[in-house]
């Protein structure tokens, strides 16, 4: 049966994408798509170079008369995100993607389409194939494992490239040119905490801060959305300041390093006679929180629920551990730390208190930081490390992603924008990404 993509324009682009979408290419399993691209290059006499990670560079000779032009690198990645609906029977390791054309949209049937970044790879191949395109020397850089680890970008052997100008073909918005991106780093910690039995006459309660919007710690950090961990900490501290003797059994909030926590749950113990007063403090805090965050988190709620008294809720943090924990959560930075001095409206540096998880012998913390200026990124990491260590926590680091500092005066940016306006009759939108995954690939 003929593919519905083959009649679409521009034909070369869709012909290449049609070939790509039929090839299984999960992250870390790019062998078949790599072979497909390599065969395409060999059939045309293009030189192919590979590095140890499996990324490849295809050298495309210049058209006649353009041999002395600068080499341009066209970059994309070979793998795709593999997700399917629960009612779809599909094996991404052995099957290609079934597609349909719905008006102006190309869609997959119950699975991800793989246009990220199959369409970018197809565009580079079509560009090299089109006899009417006049160009200088080209290098098509196709990296591996972008979606699950950026392995190809991080392990790229620069010796397989000769060009100095790179155009990344893995973006989402029509009419947008991206000129910079934040780098990122995670700082994790573990704080040991001793326990004791709760006081006689005390009862367990669950404090829930929920209903917040959360969101991506890069894209949404500028909106100043509430952090449920921070807010739950404030409720407990407010109760202590009000003279209520609150013991903490556990605090758990957040789930992912790159997400703003939407919920946080704290199990506490307090004297039964102080329960109404504690509820009053929580209600007052909720009023304050709505005054601060109603524009971003209108569904925020603070709830106090009584719990069954059992052995698990009777083992509370000792007072020293409780106070260290609350001071730590209160002190860890969260939100926008600085705005760019060069690009109006751009977040330059931020921090995200992402996860707190109570374990038997202590508490685990996950924090993430972003900046388009690498010295600022490492300064935040050092500051967060100092805060953890002052609380007696041990610290560990994940690998950082390098940032890509924006340069509004970049000659290639200006040339690209001029060409876009000449071809499409309108000015492109010049954008910046505040997510770290793209920085590693483009920077």
Can you say where each PLM-predicted feature lies in the sequence?
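Acidic/His- and Gly-rich active-site-bordering loop/insert found
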Residues: 3-105
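A short beta-alpha structural unit
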Residues: 18-22, 254, 267, 301-314, ...
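Short beta-strand-to-loop capping motifs
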Residues: 60, 209, 268-272, 369-371
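Active-site metal-coordination/substrate-binding segment of hydrolases
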Residues: 66-148, 153-164, 319-322, 330-349, ...
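Fold-level recognition of mixed alpha/beta catalytic cores in primary-metabolism enzymes, strongest
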Residues: 136-228, 240-241
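Acidic-enriched catalytic cores of C-N bond-cleaving enzymes acting on peptides and small amides
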Residues: 197-202, 221-252, 272-350, 384-389
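Non-catalytic terminal/interface segments that mediate subunit docking, oligomerization
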Residues: 338-390, 394
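Single conserved hydrophobic/aromatic residue that forms the stacking wall/gate
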Residues: 434-443
């Amino acid at each position: 049966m003929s593919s519905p993509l083959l009649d679409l324009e521009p034909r070369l682009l869709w012909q290449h994408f049609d070939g790509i979408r039929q090839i299984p290419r999960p992250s870390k399993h790019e062998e078949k798509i790599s072979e497909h691209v390599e065969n395409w290059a060999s059939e045309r006499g293009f030189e192919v170079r590979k590095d140890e990670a499996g990324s490849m560079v295809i050298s495309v000779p210049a058209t006649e008369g353009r041999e002395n032009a600068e080499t341009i690198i066209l970059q994309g990645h070979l793998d795709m995100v593999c997700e399917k609906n629960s009612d779809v029977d599909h094996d991404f390791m052995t099957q290609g993607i079934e597609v349909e054309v719905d008006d102006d949209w190309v869609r997959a049937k119950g699975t991800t389409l793989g246009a990220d970044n199959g369409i970018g790879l197809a565009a580079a191949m079509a560009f090299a194939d089109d006899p009417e395109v006049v160009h200088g020397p080209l290098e098509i850089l196709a990296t591996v494992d972008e979606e699950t680890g950026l392995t190809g970008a991080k392990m790229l052997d620069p010796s397989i490239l000769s060009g100095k100008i790179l155009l990344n073909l893995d973006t989402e918005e029509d009419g947008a040119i991206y000129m910079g991106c934040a780098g990122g780093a995670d700082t994790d910690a573990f704080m040991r905490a001793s326990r004791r039995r709760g006081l006689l006459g005390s009862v367990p309660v669950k404090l829930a801060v929920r209903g917040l919007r959360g969101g991506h710690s890069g894209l949404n950090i500028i909106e100043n959305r509430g952090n449920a961990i921070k807010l739950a900490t404030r409720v407990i501290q407010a109760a202590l300041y009000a003279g209520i003797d609150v013991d903490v059994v556990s605090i758990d909030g957040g789930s992912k390093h790159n997400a703003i926590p939407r919920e946080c749950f704290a199990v506490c113990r307090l004297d039964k006679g102080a329960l109404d007063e504690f509820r009053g403090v929580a209600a007052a805090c909720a009023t304050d929180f709505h005054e601060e965050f109603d524009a971003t988190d209108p569904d925020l709620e603070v709830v106090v629920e009584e719990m069954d008294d059992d052995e698990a809720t009777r083992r509370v943090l000792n007072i020293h551990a409780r106070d260290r924990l609350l001071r730590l959560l209160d002190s860890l930075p969260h939100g926008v730390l600085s705005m760019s001095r060069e690009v109006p409206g751009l977040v330059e540096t931020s921090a995200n208190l992402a996860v707190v998880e109570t374990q038997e012998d202590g508490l685990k913390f996950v924090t993430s930081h972003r900046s388009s200026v690498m010295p600022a990124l490492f300064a935040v990491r050092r500051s967060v490390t100092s805060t953890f260590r002052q609380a007696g926590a041990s610290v560990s680091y994940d690998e950082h992603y390098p940032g890509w500092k924006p340069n509004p005066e970049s000659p290639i940016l200006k040339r690209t924008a001029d060409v876009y306006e000449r071809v499409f009759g309108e000015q492109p939108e010049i954008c910046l990404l505040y997510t770290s995954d793209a920085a590693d690939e483009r920077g």
